[in-house]
């Protein structure tokens, strides 16, 4: 169904069964598949292809040659009706690719809201990207990667499958991330190693001086105390009782499966 207030360019192809919301704009030479839902106010500039069982929220801007919901690159994929879900107010720039999930990985590739995905960024099957994240030009996420809120991944950076990028992390450009990056950390290199706390990012987002100090103390326990992670976990949990921002570390530890960058 195409809402009567939506615009569809005469050269665009919107297949029967697709849903186009109010005030959406489907530009020249776009292709929208039969199981696609485009939310209110979302703009497909031109030459955008949206396939598969894909749901896109409202007020997104999707630029030319982006491909969303296409068949993933997992050799086990056998055509199952897996999905892509994208939230609201994202800017998805030229030639970005976002692939549908796999049955083995839960069947869903998910992108939240208010993200900036720069030119040629790639989000593989079963990835989860939170809110207000930035993937710079040519940043690539392998399958099953999680990127938490406010994370920034630099240009030409590759993230290994199943890795977790914590909230407020900054990964420098041209890096290779092979293990999990704890929240608030700056990481750089191939393989990526920690370079301290993303202090400037936390200041910009309104973290108090006391909270930043507590986060830095947790970082020092993890990386500079000479203790094992199991040894410092109780100390970080105790610190989190006073400073709730530190709880992001304890929650992260519970999710981590690949070990932390070192």
Swiss-Prot record:
One Pfam family, short name: Acetyltransf_11
Catalytic activity from the UniProt record: a (3R)-hydroxyacyl-[ACP] + UDP-N-acetyl-alpha-D-glucosamine = a UDP-3-O-[(3R)-3-hydroxyacyl]-N-acetyl-alpha-D-glucosamine + holo-[ACP]
Signal peptide (residue range): none
This protein's UniProt keywords: Acyltransferase, Cytoplasm, Lipid A biosynthesis, Lipid biosynthesis, Lipid metabolism, Repeat, Transferase
Molecular-function GO terms, alphabetical: acyl-[acyl-carrier-protein]-UDP-N-acetylglucosamine O-acyltransferase activity; identical protein binding
HAMAP family for this protein: LpxA
Protein name: Acyl-[acyl-carrier-protein]--UDP-N-acetylglucosamine O-acyltransferase
UniProt source species: Escherichia coli (strain K12)
